[in-house]
Amino acid sequence: MRPPAPFVPEEHQLQPGYAMVVVGFGSPEEHAAVLDQARSAVPPLVDFASPMPYVELQKMLDEANAWGFFCYDKGCYVEELSDGLIDALVERFPQKTSPLSIVLFYRLDGAYSEPAEDATAFSGGRSPRYGTFIIGVCPAPEMLPAERAWVTSIADALRPYATQDEPLT
């Protein structure tokens, strides 16, 4: 859900949307090139990009993950965001009951792909891919069964698109 915040146009507040967080450790020019490519592919409704200390990046989502929430999650790796995968998400995403629940895609590429597949403690292959996280987050325990069903429904729908190596959960 887009927040009811001053930087979001009023007609788009509290409507489904997406956010893209781009993290890079290369040069400012490399980062700008990635942002330019993303902006041209999917023009943003709201755009904010700024260098920040890594610790600030880590704290950026703390408020949305406060202590006391009830959560259930599943995940997998997918190699591409195919039309079938997107259709599965579009069909099931509106079925969530909690506005806090989310589906995240982390692009794993670049330095992630450099070590040999058995060279680190992080399991799974090292080929470029997306780590996919389906997270049901509820402020009250009575909401959790419905969110658990939502998470499981999406995980089951994404299974045909998942890689065959070790799943995240």
Question: Over which residues does each language-model region extend?
Answer:
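Soluble FAD-dependent oxygen oxidases
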Residues: 1-169
